[in-house]
Amino acid sequence: MKTQRDGHSLGGWSLMLLLLGLLMPLAIVAQVLSYKEAVLRAIDGINQRSSDANLYRLLDLDPRPTMDGDPDTPKPVSFTVKETVCPRTTQQSPEDCDFKKDGLVKRCVGTVTLNQARDSFDISCDKDNRRFASLGNFFRKARKKIGEEFKRIVQRIKDFLQHLIPRTEA
């Protein structure tokens, strides 16, 4: 009888090992970050390396580019962060901080990996100058419209003066 019981126990262990083997890939899959989660981790890294007084928080995340399924392959990312009211020395999550009024905005580009165990990123951030580019476009369009309106006014004055001058019949 002892042998029969030992056989059942060995079968139980075999079944347990089989189930464990089947569940291991699921545990590995669970370590893959979403695109946004990987970007948020990169922002945490940016905040840790920053010499600025306050934390930065995600303001805008560009759409996820089409990517391969390998979580270890670096994925291109681009996003915008904005300065918050929370000091960098706080233990608070940037997501819990309000944006600072007129806070510094930075445009960030680089790569992240989605494998949580590897957790690598290569991101560089620069002051966002798109606001100033928009301002330049505004003045360019305004100058063009003013120029077109000025030409129309000059043409109306010419037409008016043409009608005032008496015509001489030849």
From Swiss-Prot:
Belongs to the cathelicidin family. It comes from the Eukaryota. It comes from Hylobates moloch (Silvery gibbon). Keywords: Antibiotic, Antimicrobial, Cleavage on pair of basic residues, Disulfide bond, Immunity, Innate immunity, Secreted, Signal. Proteolytically cleaved by proteinase PRTN3 into antibacterial peptide LL-37. Proteolytically cleaved by cathepsin CTSG and neutrophil elastase ELANE. After secretion onto the skin surface, the CAMP gene product is processed by a serine protease-dependent mechanism into multiple novel antimicrobial peptides distinct from and shorter than cathelicidin LL-37. These peptides show enhanced antimicrobial action, acquiring the ability to kill skin pathogens such as S.aureus, E.coli and C.albicans. These peptides have lost the ability to stimulate CXCL8/IL8 release from keratinocytes. The peptides act synergistically, killing bacteria at lower concentrations when present together, and maintain activity at increased salt condition. Antimicrobial protein that is an integral component of the innate immune system. Binds to bacterial lipopolysaccharides (LPS). Acts via neutrophil N-formyl peptide receptors to enhance the release of CXCL2. Postsecretory processing generates multiple cathelicidin antimicrobial peptides with various lengths which act as a topical antimicrobial defense in sweat on skin. The unprocessed precursor form, cathelicidin antimicrobial peptide, inhibits the growth of Gram-negative E.coli and E.aerogenes with efficiencies comparable to that of the mature peptide LL-37 (in vitro). Residues 150-162 are annotated as: Active core. The gene is CAMP. The lineage of its organism: Eukaryota, Metazoa, Chordata, Craniata, Vertebrata. Residues 1-30 form the signal peptide. One of its GO terms (molecular function) is lipopolysaccharide binding. This is Cathelicidin antimicrobial peptide. Residues 31-131 form a propeptide. Disulfide bonds join C86-C97, C108-C125. InterPro entries: Cathelicidin-like, Cathelicidin_CS, Cathlecidin_C, Cystatin_sf. GO terms for biological process: antimicrobial humoral immune response mediated by antimicrobial peptide; defense response to Gram-negative bacterium; defense response to Gram-positive bacterium; innate immune response; neutrophil activation. It is found in: Secreted; Vesicle. The cathelin-like domain (CLD), which is the propeptide part, does not seem to exhibit auto-inhibitory function, as it does not inhibit the antibacterial activity of antibacterial peptide LL-37. GO terms for cellular component: extracellular space; vesicle. PROSITE patterns: CATHELICIDINS_1, CATHELICIDINS_2.
